[in-house]
């Protein structure tokens, strides 16, 4: 493990019931107890496979390895209830990932890339980002099925890179979802204003803040069911929209056959941004649409977050990953293609400020085709989508905090759970950030809120970057141990090439995402808003690097690919094959 005598002494004390202090947990090794599932360590070589972070102890003269990270009850010898429940089925996992990605970024966010890059430029951007999303989910799938833990990829950053990287990645990712929750709350009222202005925006924020927080206190199986049905509504709405658009393009609307009319006039490429030179401006417009696409695709990694609460994760997670990414690509690319055919990039409605929903290219496409009732129906779909997204925000944020706490990177109380396996304190801490939504109702508060949103977007880029880097280290660790990737429950395709591909381009995107701050002249405020998240990440990393005083990156022999995995391998899962018509139907759909 470590070479110095001092580190060896620390390891020996840790292995044999000496008090051990970690960042947020003061743990005595004597507090861990032998329980079902503990693994006897018969020889010195086996001990070396388990790093210090896993709290081994001696019981009845034998070394045992506790899977509960030292959280135990001293009096009764039983582990305290500090675990989530594995109650998510495959159909839940697939729809949670779909629901987390298909949100306001699709229904409303497509207006910006369409305006700046035109229909073809935006289409190319989303295809390119789709390839990165595929690469990242393949990497995550291989790791999350081998070690299916809650808050998976933040845990992988800690185990495969270093505790400091794990903490920085985890806290930034959690902050991202907590702030996004506030965004969704602020948008709910604006969507309802499509119908009425009689109720103040602050009232809608308060109502949905309370409702969504309470929803996240129910056991995860209820969350899974809610997300399944809401995501089903979104999927059906998009499929219906694609069929509707196909009919409109072929001439069913008031405009007659549209075909590729708008690709000829005003054109397939947008006017561009910043530069007066036409070609240069169009290229910069395409780059801006690429960054917008990167923001929009964030959420495809949610399959990994659910791995710790998935029933039979070795089968359900790979199945979900194989289906989800292609469905997301189909919905995004298909929607963007038809929107580009029905809405010209210079349509003034794309940039109007009368209401938040009025800029949705979906609603504009319906209005341009002359269908009067559908805009109201689709606005209801958007409202449902936002409520679903806000629900996912708290779920993901709370599980990230739970994972940080379980891995000694956050206070111990954040890993407390209800009898139903809900980390309720982590839920309340994440939900508390919903108060920031009220900033949208105050003078000047919206500017501060915009800053916070910039931080959240780049935090998602860091998550994708570290998923790819962690997977590279994971593959190196497997090779070092002599484990063939062919033996894994799920083997990612085209690796390690795709992992390097995703890591390279995510690094480039993180660097260039604030390029508009430099042109046509440097803007200090815009620069700070775009890049403050990078400095925050570095600050958190430096803080935890100083606290842990660890290596910049683990030696390959110290990479932990064993903790939590052995418990899963000891379980015999029932594989429920679909038998009824509806079971088979949902198996295909979800």
From Swiss-Prot:
Key word Oxidoreductase present? no
- Indicate the principal place this protein occupies in or around the cell: membrane
Mutation: residue 308 to A; reported impact is: In CAN1-341; confers citrulline transport activity in GAP1-deleted cells
Describe how it is modified after translation: Phosphorylated probably at multiple sites.
Q: What is the effect of changing residue 451 to C?
A: In CAN1-328; confers citrulline transport activity in GAP1-deleted cells
Q: Which Pfam families match?
A: AA_permease
Q: Tell me what the record says results from residue 356 to H.
A: In CAN1-340; confers citrulline transport activity in GAP1-deleted cells
Q: Which UniProt keywords apply?
A: Amino-acid transport, Cell membrane, Endosome, Membrane, Phosphoprotein, Transmembrane, Transmembrane helix, Transport
Report the outcome of residue 149 to F. Answer: In CAN1-315; confers citrulline transport activity in GAP1-deleted cells
Residues with Phosphoserine modification:
54, 66
According to its UniProt entry, the protein's GO biological process terms are: amino acid transmembrane transport; basic amino acid transport; L-arginine transmembrane transport; transmembrane transport
What residue intervals traverse the membrane? 93-113, 117-137, 172-192, 199-219, 235-255, 283-303, 324-344, 377-397, 420-440, 449-469, 498-518, 524-544
The membrane-topology field of this record reads: Multi-pass membrane protein
At the top level, the lineage of the source is Eukaryota
Q: Where does it localize?
A: Cell membrane; Endosome membrane
Subunit field text: Interacts with RRT2.
According to its UniProt entry, what is the function of this protein? High-affinity permease for arginine.
Q: Member of which family? A: Belongs to the amino acid-polyamine-organocation (APC) superfamily. YAT (TC 2.A.3.10) family.
Q: What is this protein called?
A: Arginine permease CAN1
What organism is recorded for this protein? Answer: Saccharomyces cerevisiae (strain ATCC 204508 / S288c) (Baker's yeast)
């Amino acid at each position: 493990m470590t070479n110095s005598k001092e580190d060896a002494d620390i390891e020996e004390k840790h292995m044999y019931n000496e008090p051990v202090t970690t960042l947020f947990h003061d743990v005595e090794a004597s507090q861990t107890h032998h329980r079902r599932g503990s693994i006897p360590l018969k020889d010195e070589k086996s001990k070396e496979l388990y790093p210090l972070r896993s709290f081994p102890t001696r019981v009845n003269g034998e070394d045992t390895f506790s899977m509960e990270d030292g959280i135990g009850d001293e009096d009764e010898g039983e582990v305290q209830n500090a675990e989530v429940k594995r109650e998510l089925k495959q159909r839940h996992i697939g729809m949670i990932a779909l629901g987390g990605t298909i949100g306001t970024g699709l229904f409303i966010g497509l207006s910006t890339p369409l305006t700046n890059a035109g229909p073809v430029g935006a289409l190319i951007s989303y295809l390119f980002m789709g390839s990165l999303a595929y690469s990242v989910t393949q990497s995550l799938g291989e790791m999350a099925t081998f070690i299916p833990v809650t808050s998976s990829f933040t845990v992988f950053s800690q185990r495969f890179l270093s505790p400091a990287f794990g903490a920085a990645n985890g806290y930034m990712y959690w902050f991202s979802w907590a702030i996004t929750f506030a965004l969704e709350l602020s948008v709910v009222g604006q969507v309802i204003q499509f119908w009425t202005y009689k109720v103040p925006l602050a009232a809608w924020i308060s109502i949905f803040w309370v409702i969504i927080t309470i929803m996240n206190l129910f056991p995860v199986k209820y969350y899974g069911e809610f997300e399944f049905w809401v995501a089903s509504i979104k999927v059906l709405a998009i499929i219906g929209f694609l069929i509707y658009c196909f009919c409109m393009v072929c001439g069913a609307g008031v405009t007659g056959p549209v075909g590729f009319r708008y690709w000829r006039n005003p054109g397939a490429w947008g006017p561009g941004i910043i530069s007066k030179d036409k070609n240069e401006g169009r290229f910069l417009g395409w780059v801006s649409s690429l960054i917008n696409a990167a923001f929009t695709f964030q959420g495809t990694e949610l399959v990994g977050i659910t791995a710790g609460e998935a029933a039979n994760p070795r089968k359900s997670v790979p199945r979900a990953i194989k289906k989800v990414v292609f469905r997301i690509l189909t919905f995004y690319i298909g929607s963007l293609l038809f929107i580009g055919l029905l809405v010209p990039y210079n349509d003034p409605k794309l940039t109007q400020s009368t209401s938040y929903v009025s800029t949705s290219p979906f609603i504009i496409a319906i209005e341009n085709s002359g269908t009067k009732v559908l805009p109201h129906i689709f606005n209801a779909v958007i409202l449902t989508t936002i409520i679903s997204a806000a629900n996912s925000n708290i779920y993901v944020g709370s599980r990230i905090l739970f994972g940080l706490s379980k891995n000694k990177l956050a206070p111990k109380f954040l890993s407390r759970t209800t009898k139903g396996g809900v980390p309720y304190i982590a839920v309340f801490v994440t939900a508390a950030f919903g108060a920031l939504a009220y900033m949208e109702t105050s003078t000047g508060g919206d500017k501060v809120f915009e800053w916070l949103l910039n931080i959240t977007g780049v935090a998602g880029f860091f998550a994708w970057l570290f998923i790819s880097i962690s997977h590279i280290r994971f593959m190196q660790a497997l090779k070092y141990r002599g484990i063939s990737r062919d033996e894994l429950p799920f083997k990612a395709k085209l690796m390690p090439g795709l992992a390097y591909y995703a890591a390279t381009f995510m690094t480039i995107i993180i660097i260039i995402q604030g390029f508009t701050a430099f042109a046509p002249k440097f803007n200090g405020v815009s620069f700070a808003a775009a890049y403050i998240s990078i400095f925050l990440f570095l600050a958190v990393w430096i803080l935890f690097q100083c606290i842990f005083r660890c290596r910049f990156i683990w030696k390959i022999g110290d990479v932990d690919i064993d903790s939590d995995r052995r418990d899963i391998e000891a379980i015999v899962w029932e594989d429920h094959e679909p038998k009824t018509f509806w079971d088979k139907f949902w198996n295909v759909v979800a």
